[in-house]
Amino acid sequence: KENNSEETSERDCIGFCVTGGVFSEGIDLKNESLIGCIIVGTGIPQICTERRLLKDYYDEKDGNGYNYAYTYPGMNKVLQAAGRVIRTMDDVGVIVLLDERFARSEYVRLFPEEWADYKLCNLKEAPKLVAEFWDGHS
């Protein structure tokens, strides 16, 4: 969790983290210390007794149990991870969501309004879109 960005500022590096892990809060990678993230999966929590009880409760209340027990907590993790990239008005970066479920309307409606210009693509098209983004921001 220690921020060693000063030590590595002269070289490019790639870090791998788990959503909801120690890097989800309490670290501030300023300026160009973090210029992108690739989030694999929707962050849905594992099935357990607590989640089943939560799902059952909200299913009875409003029929929306799966979202409260799984979708919303998972998306919260995704948004926290994505939020590491853009911390200030001056930050620029790429957020790539790798999971077909993110293209579904029930996920798109959970995107922040700042993501309104998102692009859908397949894995083959992704490098081109990322390159075009950086060409427009260099």
Short names for language-model regions:
Residues 1-138:
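ASCE RecA-like P-loop NTPase motor cores
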